[in-house]
Amino acid sequence: MHFQIPQFKSFKFLWLALILSSVLFTGCSPSQIASSASPNYTNLPRLVGKATVVMTVKGSPITIEVDGDNAPITAGNFLDLVQKGVYNGLMFHRVVRDPQPFVAQGGDPQSKDPNFPPARLGTGGYIDPQLNIERLIPLEIKPRGQKEPFYGKTISEKPVLTHKLGAIAMARSQTPNSASSQFYFALADLGFLDGAYAVFGYVTDGIEVVNQIQQGDRIDQAEVTKGLANLKLPQ
Protein backbone atom coordinates (compact mmCIF):
# COMPACT_ATOMS: atom_id res chain seq x y z
CA MET A 1 0.00 0.00 0.00
CA HIS A 2 1.38 3.39 -0.98
CA PHE A 3 0.90 6.29 1.41
CA GLN A 4 0.06 9.81 0.35
CA ILE A 5 2.51 12.25 1.89
CA PRO A 6 1.07 15.67 2.84
CA GLN A 7 2.76 18.75 1.45
CA PHE A 8 3.89 21.26 4.06
CA LYS A 9 4.29 24.99 3.65
CA SER A 10 7.32 25.15 5.92
CA PHE A 11 10.52 23.11 5.82
CA LYS A 12 10.44 22.67 9.58
CA PHE A 13 7.45 20.36 9.19
CA LEU A 14 9.10 18.09 6.62
CA TRP A 15 9.95 15.56 9.32
CA LEU A 16 6.24 15.11 9.89
CA ALA A 17 5.75 13.84 6.36
CA LEU A 18 7.65 10.67 7.15
CA ILE A 19 5.89 10.31 10.48
CA LEU A 20 2.46 10.71 8.91
CA SER A 21 3.11 7.88 6.48
CA SER A 22 3.45 5.42 9.36
CA VAL A 23 1.73 6.99 12.35
CA LEU A 24 -1.64 8.27 11.22
CA PHE A 25 -2.05 5.90 8.31
CA THR A 26 -3.21 2.40 9.16
CA GLY A 27 -3.11 -0.77 7.15
CA CYS A 28 -6.86 -1.04 6.67
CA SER A 29 -8.24 -2.54 3.48
CA PRO A 30 -9.79 -0.13 0.95
CA SER A 31 -13.24 1.06 1.93
CA GLN A 32 -16.38 0.37 -0.04
CA ILE A 33 -18.22 3.31 1.52
CA ALA A 34 -19.42 5.79 -1.07
CA SER A 35 -18.42 9.44 -0.83
CA SER A 36 -21.28 11.83 -0.24
CA ALA A 37 -21.97 15.21 1.27
CA SER A 38 -25.34 14.09 2.72
CA PRO A 39 -25.21 10.34 3.33
CA ASN A 40 -27.53 8.12 5.29
CA TYR A 41 -25.24 5.62 6.98
CA THR A 42 -27.96 3.62 8.69
CA ASN A 43 -25.67 0.62 9.19
CA LEU A 44 -23.35 2.48 11.57
CA PRO A 45 -23.71 3.64 15.19
CA ARG A 46 -24.48 7.32 15.59
CA LEU A 47 -24.10 9.67 18.56
CA VAL A 48 -26.83 12.29 18.85
CA GLY A 49 -25.43 14.98 21.12
CA LYS A 50 -22.42 14.58 23.38
CA ALA A 51 -21.07 11.90 25.68
CA THR A 52 -18.22 11.46 28.15
CA VAL A 53 -15.67 8.66 28.14
CA VAL A 54 -13.13 8.02 30.88
CA MET A 55 -10.07 6.17 29.62
CA THR A 56 -7.68 4.87 32.26
CA VAL A 57 -4.01 4.44 31.37
CA LYS A 58 -1.60 3.00 33.96
CA GLY A 59 -4.14 3.74 36.69
CA SER A 60 -4.69 7.39 35.76
CA PRO A 61 -7.94 8.68 34.19
CA ILE A 62 -8.32 10.70 30.99
CA THR A 63 -11.73 12.34 30.55
CA ILE A 64 -12.85 12.77 26.94
CA GLU A 65 -15.86 14.72 25.69
CA VAL A 66 -17.07 12.95 22.55
CA ASP A 67 -18.88 15.28 20.13
CA GLY A 68 -21.78 13.74 18.27
CA ASP A 69 -23.17 17.14 17.37
CA ASN A 70 -20.35 17.74 14.90
CA ALA A 71 -19.12 14.19 14.18
CA PRO A 72 -22.09 11.86 14.77
CA ILE A 73 -20.80 8.77 12.97
CA THR A 74 -17.18 9.01 14.10
CA ALA A 75 -18.24 9.71 17.69
CA GLY A 76 -20.89 6.99 17.55
CA ASN A 77 -18.40 4.42 16.31
CA PHE A 78 -15.93 5.27 19.10
CA LEU A 79 -18.59 5.24 21.81
CA ASP A 80 -19.95 1.90 20.59
CA LEU A 81 -16.47 0.35 20.66
CA VAL A 82 -15.89 1.74 24.16
CA GLN A 83 -19.19 0.28 25.31
CA LYS A 84 -18.25 -3.11 23.81
CA GLY A 85 -14.96 -3.09 25.74
CA VAL A 86 -12.90 -3.16 22.56
CA TYR A 87 -10.26 -0.74 23.86
CA ASN A 88 -9.66 -2.45 27.19
CA GLY A 89 -6.12 -3.81 27.27
CA LEU A 90 -5.04 -2.31 23.95
CA MET A 91 -1.63 -0.72 23.48
CA PHE A 92 -0.50 2.72 22.40
CA HIS A 93 1.67 1.29 19.65
CA ARG A 94 3.06 4.59 18.31
CA VAL A 95 3.97 7.64 20.37
CA VAL A 96 5.88 10.45 18.66
CA ARG A 97 7.37 13.32 20.66
CA ASP A 98 10.71 13.96 18.95
CA PRO A 99 11.77 16.29 17.52
CA GLN A 100 8.41 17.86 18.44
CA PRO A 101 5.30 16.53 20.24
CA PHE A 102 2.98 14.92 17.69
CA VAL A 103 0.61 12.05 18.53
CA ALA A 104 -0.07 9.06 20.78
CA GLN A 105 -1.82 6.42 18.66
CA GLY A 106 -3.62 3.29 19.82
CA GLY A 107 -6.74 1.23 19.24
CA ASP A 108 -5.40 -1.65 17.14
CA PRO A 109 -7.24 -4.75 18.46
CA GLN A 110 -4.26 -6.90 17.48
CA SER A 111 -2.25 -5.24 20.25
CA LYS A 112 -4.23 -7.15 22.88
CA ASP A 113 -2.19 -10.23 21.95
CA PRO A 114 1.21 -9.90 23.70
CA ASN A 115 2.73 -12.24 21.11
CA PHE A 116 1.59 -10.23 18.09
CA PRO A 117 4.61 -8.91 16.11
CA PRO A 118 5.16 -5.26 17.11
CA ALA A 119 6.18 -4.33 13.57
CA ARG A 120 2.69 -5.24 12.33
CA LEU A 121 0.80 -3.16 14.87
CA GLY A 122 -1.16 -0.37 13.24
CA THR A 123 -2.66 -2.63 10.58
CA GLY A 124 -5.73 -3.84 12.46
CA GLY A 125 -9.30 -2.69 12.93
CA TYR A 126 -12.50 -3.79 14.65
CA ILE A 127 -13.97 -6.99 13.20
CA ASP A 128 -17.75 -7.12 13.58
CA PRO A 129 -18.37 -10.55 15.18
CA GLN A 130 -21.80 -10.90 13.59
CA LEU A 131 -20.75 -10.02 10.05
CA ASN A 132 -17.14 -11.24 10.37
CA ILE A 133 -15.89 -8.20 8.45
CA GLU A 134 -13.98 -5.10 9.47
CA ARG A 135 -16.18 -2.14 10.37
CA LEU A 136 -15.05 0.88 8.37
CA ILE A 137 -16.44 4.38 8.78
CA PRO A 138 -16.35 7.33 6.38
CA LEU A 139 -14.10 10.34 6.76
CA GLU A 140 -16.42 12.82 8.48
CA ILE A 141 -15.48 16.50 8.79
CA LYS A 142 -17.83 19.42 9.40
CA PRO A 143 -16.66 22.75 7.94
CA ARG A 144 -17.38 25.89 9.88
CA GLY A 145 -20.61 27.53 8.77
CA GLN A 146 -22.13 24.27 7.50
CA LYS A 147 -25.09 22.50 9.07
CA GLU A 148 -23.89 18.99 8.29
CA PRO A 149 -20.51 17.24 8.04
CA PHE A 150 -18.96 16.37 4.69
CA TYR A 151 -18.22 12.71 4.06
CA GLY A 152 -15.66 10.74 2.14
CA LYS A 153 -13.28 13.55 1.25
CA THR A 154 -10.76 15.92 2.76
CA ILE A 155 -11.65 19.60 2.90
CA SER A 156 -9.71 22.85 2.58
CA GLU A 157 -12.14 24.84 4.75
CA LYS A 158 -11.52 25.27 8.48
CA PRO A 159 -13.37 22.51 10.36
CA VAL A 160 -15.47 22.96 13.47
CA LEU A 161 -13.37 20.37 15.32
CA THR A 162 -9.70 21.26 15.01
CA HIS A 163 -6.48 19.49 15.93
CA LYS A 164 -5.69 21.47 19.05
CA LEU A 165 -3.77 19.99 21.96
CA GLY A 166 -5.87 17.20 23.48
CA ALA A 167 -7.93 16.48 20.37
CA ILE A 168 -8.84 12.85 19.74
CA ALA A 169 -9.17 11.79 16.10
CA MET A 170 -9.34 8.69 13.93
CA ALA A 171 -6.31 7.16 12.23
CA ARG A 172 -6.86 5.77 8.73
CA SER A 173 -5.08 4.59 5.59
CA GLN A 174 -4.63 6.84 2.55
CA THR A 175 -8.17 5.85 1.55
CA PRO A 176 -10.47 8.44 3.19
CA ASN A 177 -13.16 5.96 4.23
CA SER A 178 -10.92 3.48 6.00
CA ALA A 179 -10.99 4.39 9.71
CA SER A 180 -12.08 1.61 12.04
CA SER A 181 -10.93 1.51 15.67
CA GLN A 182 -7.52 3.19 15.72
CA PHE A 183 -7.38 6.69 17.17
CA TYR A 184 -4.79 9.21 18.26
CA PHE A 185 -4.41 12.02 20.78
CA ALA A 186 -2.87 15.26 19.52
CA LEU A 187 0.13 16.07 21.72
CA ALA A 188 0.33 19.63 20.37
CA ASP A 189 -1.65 22.00 18.17
CA LEU A 190 -1.56 20.22 14.78
CA GLY A 191 -3.48 22.58 12.55
CA PHE A 192 -1.88 21.21 9.38
CA LEU A 193 -3.96 18.03 9.90
CA ASP A 194 -7.26 19.94 9.94
CA GLY A 195 -9.55 18.91 7.12
CA ALA A 196 -7.64 15.68 6.47
CA TYR A 197 -8.43 13.60 9.58
CA ALA A 198 -11.62 13.34 11.62
CA VAL A 199 -11.48 14.88 15.08
CA PHE A 200 -14.41 13.73 17.21
CA GLY A 201 -13.70 15.04 20.70
CA TYR A 202 -11.32 16.56 23.21
CA VAL A 203 -9.63 15.70 26.47
CA THR A 204 -11.33 17.79 29.16
CA ASP A 205 -9.39 16.43 32.14
CA GLY A 206 -6.19 14.44 32.43
CA ILE A 207 -4.13 16.02 29.66
CA GLU A 208 -1.11 15.51 31.91
CA VAL A 209 -1.80 11.76 31.69
CA VAL A 210 -1.90 11.96 27.90
CA ASN A 211 1.40 13.82 27.92
CA GLN A 212 2.99 10.99 29.91
CA ILE A 213 1.84 8.13 27.64
CA GLN A 214 4.78 6.06 26.41
CA GLN A 215 4.89 3.68 23.48
CA GLY A 216 3.86 0.28 24.80
CA ASP A 217 1.56 1.62 27.53
CA ARG A 218 -1.86 -0.05 27.62
CA ILE A 219 -5.39 1.17 28.19
CA ASP A 220 -6.56 -0.34 31.47
CA GLN A 221 -10.18 0.43 30.73
CA ALA A 222 -12.39 2.80 28.79
CA GLU A 223 -15.97 3.38 29.86
CA VAL A 224 -18.88 5.65 28.98
CA THR A 225 -19.73 7.71 32.06
CA LYS A 226 -22.28 10.09 30.54
CA GLY A 227 -24.47 10.28 27.45
CA LEU A 228 -24.82 6.59 26.63
CA ALA A 229 -28.52 7.15 25.93
CA ASN A 230 -27.44 9.39 23.04
CA LEU A 231 -25.86 6.43 21.23
CA LYS A 232 -28.15 5.16 18.47
CA LEU A 233 -27.36 1.70 17.16
CA PRO A 234 -28.39 0.27 13.77
CA GLN A 235 -31.69 -1.55 13.83
Model-derived segments and spans:
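Bacterial N-terminal signal peptides that target proteins for export
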Residues: 2-15
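Bacterial N-terminal signal peptides
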Residues: 15-26
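Cross-family detector of peptidyl-prolyl cis-trans isomerase
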Residues: 2, 28-235
